């Protein structure tokens, strides 16, 4: 379900994510730059994190089982796009740093998030002009909404960024 060669996915593709978006989200999760390498421990941690995210994303599981098309997920849901994946990676970074003992349990709350693109929260943060925005600000604002859904206090920087949310 990963597009290995291209940096975007065509409308009719059966792929869910690009390799590039997975790499970006994992770098955000581990706080790494594009030139950094991963230790064996970091690789294991990232693998565990993404496996637990998958277990808490019923739509992704349905796509793997071919109970829903990836095209439909991309049309209707934020979590089926790189911007959503990247925001989940950023959320994971916060969880790993601030909740090292409970982050696994916290991920269960991902199931209760309304990931539909029509959710007004995403319209204001990730889709300010009616289409997905992949800007750094949009990714961070999306992550802020995830933090709020998981009852994670926003940092001072996050709070300042919240002032940019379209009301």
What label would you give each PLM region?
Residues 1-167:
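Accessory terminal alpha-helical modules
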């Amino acid at each position: 379900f990963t597009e290995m060669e291209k940096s975007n996915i065509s409308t009719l593709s059966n792929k869910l994510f690009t390799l590039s978006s997975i790499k970006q989200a994992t770098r955000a999760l581990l706080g790494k730059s594009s030139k950094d390498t991963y230790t064996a421990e970091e690789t294991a941690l990232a693998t565990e994190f993404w496996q637990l995210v998958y277990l808490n994303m019923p739509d992704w599981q349905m796509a793997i089982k071919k109970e829903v098309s990836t095209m439909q997920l991309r049309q209707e849901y934020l979590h089926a796009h790189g911007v959503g994946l990247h925001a989940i990676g950023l959320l994971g970074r916060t969880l790993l740093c601030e909740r090292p003992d409970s982050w696994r349990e916290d991920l269960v709350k991902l199931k209760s998030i309304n990931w539909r693109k029509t959710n007004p929260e995403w319209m204001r943060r990730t889709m300010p002009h009616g289409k997905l925005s992949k800007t750094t600000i949009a990714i961070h604002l999306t992550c802020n909404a995830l933090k709020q859904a998981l009852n994670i206090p926003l940092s001072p920087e996050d709070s300042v960024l919240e002032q940019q949310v379209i009301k």
